[in-house]
Amino acid sequence: MERTLVLIKPDGVQRGLVGEVIARLERRGLRLVGAKFMQVSQELAETHYAIHKGKPFYDGLIAYITSAPVMAMAWEGPNAIAAVRQTMGATRPTEAAPGSVRHDFGLEVGRNLTHASDSVENGQAEVSLWFTEQELVSWSRALDPWIFE
């Protein structure tokens, strides 16, 4: 069972899209195992986006992600990484598939509404960065056998 981090970034929160994103992921069959509405600290932002340090957009990215609250979530399910990334759409909203969150609501890459882990390894690392074990809930739904083999 894979776990993945999903962030609804400040633009998604400000536009009132938290419920829309959660609904799409739940309809997809994924299970929410952790969630918190939070203001991102400078330290957390710099750790999360360390891979981009030194790139021209880094300072703006850090300023943006710390500018307003985000909704941080951990989701779980078979193939959760791929399922979430499909549901969110390509990083650039203009290249995202119709029906994806970014296609339906985004216009620019700098305001692309969400972040989603891009690999199983990054999913594990990012969930651990944003959540303590005590903040994650292991549970099952009665309908899980109808979704998962």
Task: Name what the model sees in each region.
Residues 1-149:
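Non-catalytic terminal and connector segments of soluble metabolic enzymes
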